Amino acid sequence: TINIALEMGYATGIHRSSLIATAFVLLLFILLLNIILYLIKGNHINFDFITSIKDLFFIKNIKKNINEFSFKNIKMKNVSIKSEILKYISIFATIISTLFLLFIVLFILIRGLPYINFNLLFGESNNSQMTLFPAIVSTAMMLFMSLIIAVPIGVFSAIYLTEYSKANGKLIYAIRIFTDSLSGIPSIVFGLFGMLIFLDLFGLGRSVLAGSLTLVLIILPSIIRQTEETLISIPASLREGSLALGASKVRTIFKIVLPCGFSGIITAIILSIGRIVGESAALIYTSGAVRYMPAGYLNAGSSFAVMMWMFSSEGLYINQTFATASILLMIVIFLNALLFVLNNKLKKDY
C-alpha cells in the first residue's frame, strides 16, 4: 500500500499496471481470508479435514489430544493463582495502552491548540499561505454528497438482507463475504479504483464529486453491516405481532423495524462521518490536493486530512499541521461522545 500511495501519482505504462496488479492481489488476499473465516464460522471446515493432511503440515490428531486432555489433576489453588495472574496482566496491559493513548492525545493537543486561530480556520488560502477554510468547505461538500448516496443504499440493502432474503441462502453469504472484504480493504486501493473509474473512465477529473463517489464505496460496506446487525437483533415477535394485526410487510418495516433499529442506523452514520473526515489516502488521487476553494463539485478540493498532509509535506507549516491534527482529534472525540450519548438515549429494551 505504501508503494501504491507513493508511486501512483507519477507511474505510467508497465509501472502503473504493476501497481494496479498489486492492489488486485491485495483485494484477492482479503477476499480469501474472509471466505476462510466464513467457512470456519459456518462449520464447513472441521478437524477431520485438518488431520487428513497432517503428513503435509506435521499436525497431530487435534481431536484426540483434546479428548484425552483432562483437568482432573489441576488443583483449584493453582487455577486461582493463574486467574489472579491473568487479571493483573490484563489490568497492566489496560493501563499501558490507556496511558499511551492519553500521551498521544495530549501531545497533539498541546502542540496544536495554541496555533488554532481565526486566520487558520477562515482566512483566504492562496499562493502565499494555506488555510483550512477550503478544506472545511470541501469536507462538508463530500460529507453531504457521500452520505446522501450511501445511507439510502446501505439501509435498503440491509433491509433486503434481513427482511426479504433467505436467512442462510448462498447469495446472502456471498454478499456478506464481499461487504466484509470491502470493509477490510485499505483506503488507498479504493483511491486507485476511484482514479481508474471516475477519473479515467468517466472523465470526471480530480474533483469533489470523484472523491465523494469514492467515499461512498468506502463507507457503504460498514453502513450495510452495521444496519443489518441492528435489524437482525430486533425480535421476530415484533414483526409477527404487526403482521398478525393486518399490517403489510412494507408497513411493518417502516413502522416497526426501522424505528426499532434507528439507533443502529444513526451509529452507522456517525461512524461514517468520522471515516470521511479522517480519510486522506483515497482522496489524494480522486478529489485532489489543492489549497484553493472548490467552485463546485466538478472542481478539485482537499479534505481536512489531505490538507494536513499538505501542511506536513511543505515543511514550513509544522505548527499548522499540529493544529489541523488537533481539530481532527477533537472532531473524532466529539463524534464518539455523541455516539455514546445517542446510544444511551435511543437504545431500546425489547
Show the residue positions of the predicted features.
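Interhelical loop and adjacent transmembrane-helix boundary motif
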Residues: 1-27, 283-329
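Periplasmic/extracellular loop-to-transmembrane helix junction in inner-membrane transport proteins
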Residues: 6-16, 72-92, 106-146, 168, ...
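Hydrophobic alpha-helical transmembrane segments of multipass integral membrane proteins
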Residues: 29, 33, 137, 141-149, ...
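Transmembrane-helix boundary motif in ABC transporter permease subunits
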Residues: 33-45, 146-179, 192, 339-345
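Transmembrane alpha-helical segments of polytopic membrane transport and secretion proteins
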Residues: 36-96, 339-350
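Generic hydrophobic transmembrane alpha-helix motif, especially the helices
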Residues: 179-216
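Glycine/proline-centered hinge or cleavage motifs at structural transition points of membrane proteins
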Residues: 186, 245-246, 259
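Transmembrane alpha-helices
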Residues: 226-227, 235, 249-285
